[in-house]
Amino acid sequence: MNKNLSYFLDKCTYFVGCEPKEVKIRNMKNWGNCRKDKRITLNLKLAKKPPICTEYVLIHELCHLIEFNHGPRFKALMDNFCPNWREIKKLLNEEEN
């Protein structure tokens, strides 16, 4: 995942137009986390998911750098930067067989 993370991070930060202070990867309960100090953490288990899921989580967390909550403005940002985010979210949360 580290190999692909650099690619996805460059792509997504360019697309969204903001950059985190730091990105870490570790085991965690959520797929991603964004702190107010602009540090993003991604779940190591994303490596087992399709690459589009990593891109979605990165865009989701980068949007939190603009809008910290999940209100209408956040959803509008997601709709703009990742129009199919709802479908990707379903794919991400499917149980592995």
Regions found by a protein language model. Name each.
Residues 1-56, 65-97:
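Active-site-proximal or metal-binding-adjacent scaffold patches in catalytic folds
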